[in-house]
Amino acid sequence: MRKFAYCKVVLATSLVWVLLDMFLLLYFSECNKCEEKQERGLPAGDVLELVQKPHEGPGEMGKPVVIPKEDQEKMKEMFKINQFNLMASEMIALNRSLPDVRLEGCKTKVYPDNLPTTSVVIVFHNEAWSTLLRTVHSVINRSPRHMIEEIVLVDDASERDFLKRPLESYVKKLKVPVHVIRMEQRSGLIRARLKGAAVSRGQVITFLDAHCECTAGWLEPLLARIKHDRRTVVCPIIDVISDDTFEYMAGSDMTYGGFNWKLNFRWYPVPQREMDRRKGDRTLPVRTPTMAGGLFSIDRDYFQEIGTYDAGMDIWGGENLEISFRIWQCGGTLEIVTCSHVGHVFRKATPYTFPGGTGQIINKNNRRLAEVWMDEFKNFFYIISPGVTKVDYGDISSRLGLRRKLQCKPFSWYLENIYPDSQIPRHYFSLGEIRNVETNQCLDNMARKENEKVGIFNCHGMGGNQVFSYTANKEIRTDDLCLDVSKLNGPVTMLKCHHLKGNQLWEYDPVKLTLQHVNSNQCLDKATEEDSQVPSIRDCTGSRSQQWLLRNVTLPEIF
């Protein structure tokens, strides 16, 4: 009898599981039908229907989405809306699975239980429903609940209806408090973030862009660094989400933030000195001279103490370098935490328009940061970008007062101690155009890349591509590239500056006006008939075609 009773229990249990499986199968089948009927970009049904999709669906584990050939034209049209593959994004679950891309040593790290709480501030303007909500769900699903104080969504005057009441209704159902704050008029990223920070309540503010995906274990290492030192500002490794396929690709832990001559943020290899400081342990945070600006965490009170953002800046652009300089020069630390990974959709073009034009806004913002933080080195930037000096940059007295109040260090200290491998040469003999006496043409990098030939073109006096520096190391430099000659008669190419002299060593004679390549013993010459857009290098003759005028060659060295 006992055996028979036992069998009945087993059969009954099995029947329950079979019925449950059938119910779930029917449930998700109906859910998928609902999604097929819903308006593009808008959810249908309740939260469970929206979020739960089988994990073998499109884009799961970060795999690329393939659009069928018959939908390619529609895909291209939809792409224009947000400048990423909106069709692919809408095919992917809002809580899609992602690979764990952390270093193995990161996966076993143990963090304190009493980490500070954070408010996650996300600014959006006409963002796609799928990318915005995927950002929100990734924060909720991959963060310890007790560490998330709230999520603050700041709407920078979006015009799309589904980002109004439907969004507010949706986020009310989530298990984490989500507040939607509306800007009364288009204000830009900087002021919208300031609004979000002002209403936040967490001990830490974490800023994210509206098209991100957080991965497993992303938050704890960020908060742990701030708990260790509240003056530490931390960024995750920014992984790449393809704007074409939404494939998730791990970012490198061997790059950090810098900037070029035009004050554009750039990624550069982590230098050996930083590897030595960490004793080769790649799981330790990297001290970075600058941050990309889209994703970072900062102690809420410290954010106020160091002056938040410069509210005199407009929309977007330059604010990331401004806050980076300020953090370092005023006693803080800026790190990339290599055990934290957050994906970001990198677009090739922006879908947004800016009042007054993008260039005018960025010039104003860069002028403000240069005037407040770069001391005498601002003149280097102005020679590169003379148009910046023509913009009205507003009143900076409060920012200069902040610098005095915080007793911040000079920019020369920053270059020497934080960013000694900066592309700005600290010692140089000339900066500006290099003009050929005979042809009246100037050297021009033509916006070409490494390993390409340097160009020569009519002088335009607008800086930019025609600015070269003859450095104290006797290099002819354009940003991080130096003129290099590896064989007799050229060509003259642009290679990464290595500071080892050799093929990048040039001797300028201020009397003869010649630029002699020391290794080949030949002189820089005008272009030839065979190639009229590149300078040549030939045996030195002293002819006018080998004479060059270096702009500002009498400038004293900057120390």
From Swiss-Prot:
Outcome of substituting residue 457 to H: Induces a slight decrease in activity
Lumenal side: 29-559
One GO term describing the cellular component: Golgi cisterna membrane
Ligand binding (Mn(2+)): 209, 211, 344
Keyword Flavoprotein: no
Region of interest (Catalytic subdomain A), residue spans: 115-225
Tissue specificity statement from the Swiss-Prot or TrEMBL entry: Widely expressed at high level. Higher expression in kidney, heart, small intestine and cervix and to a lesser extent in all the other tissues tested.
Family the entry assigns: Belongs to the glycosyltransferase 2 family. GalNAc-T subfamily.
Protein name: Polypeptide N-acetylgalactosaminyltransferase 1
Organism: Mus musculus (Mouse)
